[in-house]
Structures are given as structure tokens and as C-alpha cells.
């Protein structure tokens, strides 16, 4: 199979898992091409070493926005718009090629990558750990209603 892989991961366990998965697919003689925005960490276990083709797509960032982003520990809305624009471009590149499937990993900033909105090929979105904020929101909501989020049993 001809497989396109997309990720915007930081270094860590998810990146290690992806690295080993790509290595495994290559051992099975699949063609694996990797597409990443410049915000992805490729210093830790670089996929360039284990894939057929590797492409980095630049995400526009000015030095001022980079400093502000570092101070705030997160990207601004403008940074996210630039990231979305880059991921849309990557999706278009993949859509124009003859891939059988696209394997998509999480995004380090928005969890579900913007690329998912634009990809037209059959795809697999691997989401090993969903963002847990929704659980906290539910617990707060239940507290305000005077209910506990835990199941209760009635004694008879």
C-alpha cells in the first residue's frame, strides 16, 4: 500500500509509537511518505530515517509571535490560523497524490488536526489519548446541578 502519514507531535511517547509504527509498515514493504508542519518535533526519533519520503511544510511565525507564544505557553489565534492554512495545504498535496490511505496522528496544539477537515482520501485518525477537559466540564456542570458525577447505589 502507499500510505501518507501526517503528524504535529512533540517529542514523547506518541512520537515514539508513531516512529515504531512507520518502521513496522516499511518492514512490511509498504510505501510510507511523511508530511509534517514545521511545528512538529523531528529531532526526537526523526521519521526521515524510517520513511520513503519526508516533507516539512513551513508554518509562518514571526519572532514577535514566537516570543509571545513562548511566554503564554500556547499559540495565539493567529498562530492557529497559520497552522490551519499550512495543514490545508498539506491536505491538498496529499489529495492530489495517489495514496491508498492517510494515517493521521494528533496535533500538539489542537489535538484533532485541522488537516482532518480537508483530507479527501480514506484516512485513519489515531487518537490515543483524548483531551480530558470535557470530563472536568461535565463534573462542574453536575456539581452545579447538585449531582455527583459518580454512580451511586441505593441500599435496600
What is the role of each PLM region?
Residues 65-111:
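An amphipathic, basic-hydrophobic alpha-helix
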Residues 101-103, 117-154:
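Active-site proximal beta-strand in glycosyltransferases
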Residues 1-3:
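Extreme N-terminal starter segment of soluble prokaryotic enzymes
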Residues 8-11, 24-76:
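N-terminal strand-loop element at the rim of the active site
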Residues 5-19:
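A short, glycine/small-residue-rich beta-strand->loop->alpha-helix junction that serves as a flexible
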Residues 10-12, 39-41, 107-110, 129-132:
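Short, solvent-exposed loop/turn segments at secondary-structure junctions
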Residues 17, 44-48, 66-71, 115-116, ...:
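Short aromatic-enriched loop/helix-cap "lid" or pocket-rim segments at secondary-structure transitions
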Amino acid at each position: 500500500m502507499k500510505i501518507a502519514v501526517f503528524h504535529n507531535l512533540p517529542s514523547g511517547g506518541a512520537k515514539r509509537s508513531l516512529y515504531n509504527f512507520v518502521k513496522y509498515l516499511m518492514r512490511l514493504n509498504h510505501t510510507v511518505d511523511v508530511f509534517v508542519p514545521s511545528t512538529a518535533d523531528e529531532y526526537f526519533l526523526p521519521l526521515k530515517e524510517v520513511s520513503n519520503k519526508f516533507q516539512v511544510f513551513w508554518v509562518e511565525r514571526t519572532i514577535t509571535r514566537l516570543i509571545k507564544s513562548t511566554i503564554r505557553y500556547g499559540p495565539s489565534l493567529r498562530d492557529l490560523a497559520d497552522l490551519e492554512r499550512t495543514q490545508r495545504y498539506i491536505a491538498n498535496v496529499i489529495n492530489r497524490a495517489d495514496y491508498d490511505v492517510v494515517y493521521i496522528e494528533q496535533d500538539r496544539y489542537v489535538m484533532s488536526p485541522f488537516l482532518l477537515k480537508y483530507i479527501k482520501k480514506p484516512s485513519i485518525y489515531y487518537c490515543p489519548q483524548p483531551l480530558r477537559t470535557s470530563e472536568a466540564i461535565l463534573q462542574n456542570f453536575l456539581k452545579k446541578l447538585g449531582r455527583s458525577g459518580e454512580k451511586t447505589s441505593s441500599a435496600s
